[in-house]
Amino acid sequence: DLTFSKQNALLRAEYQADYKSLRFFTLLSGLLNTHGLELNADILGTDKMNTAAHKATLRIGQNGVSTSATTSLRYSPLMLENELNAELALSGASMKLATNGRFKEHNAKFSLDGKATLTELSLGSAYQAMILGADSKNIFNFKI
């Protein structure tokens, strides 16, 4: 669907597919108005026990550009999740990423964030895991 009016333009496209026990769904949408442009994507795939999903947004406006995305996978006994947020504006840029995963008794987490402005530059990350009975952890911070 594509809709135009004096105030905005809307876009929406939806797709579905089924095959045996598998189901797929996709939704793409967008909005253009005086505040800017926003695009969204939602994707989902499932069967009786497992799920994979992705959701993303892109915004372009007077204040800058931002994006976010979330992805998850559950395929028993495996579980993965990822989340990303980023922004670029006249005042600077920032980004955050968080990822974690689990397979039976094993797990790992990772995060990364950064920021850049006219007066500051920073980067940080953290890693923590329990794999094959061994604990590990690493933290990194950098700032100017």
UniProtKB/Swiss-Prot annotation:
GO terms under cellular component: cytoplasm; lipid droplet; low-density lipoprotein particle; mature chylomicron; very-low-density lipoprotein particle
Entry GO MF terms: cholesterol transfer activity; heparin binding; low-density lipoprotein particle receptor binding
Principal cellular location given in the protein's record: cytoplasm
Keywords, comma-separated and alphabetical: Cholesterol metabolism, Chylomicron, Cytoplasm, Heparin-binding, LDL, Lipid droplet, Lipid metabolism, Lipid transport, Secreted, Steroid metabolism, Sterol metabolism, Transport, VLDL
Cellular location(s): Cytoplasm; Secreted; Lipid droplet
Any single biological process term in GO: cholesterol homeostasis
Signal peptide: none
Tissue specificity field: Detected in liver (at protein level). Highly expressed in liver. Detected at lower levels in jejunum, duodenum and kidney.
Subunit-structure text: Interacts with PCSK9. Interacts with MTTP. Interacts with AUP1. Interacts with CIDEB.
Function: Apolipoprotein B is a major protein constituent of chylomicrons (apo B-48), LDL (apo B-100) and VLDL (apo B-100). Apo B-100 functions as a recognition signal for the cellular binding and internalization of LDL particles by the apoB/E receptor.
The protein's name in its UniProt record: Apolipoprotein B
Species in which this protein is naturally found: Oryctolagus cuniculus
Lineage, opening ranks: Eukaryota, Metazoa, Chordata, Craniata, Vertebrata
Gene: APOB
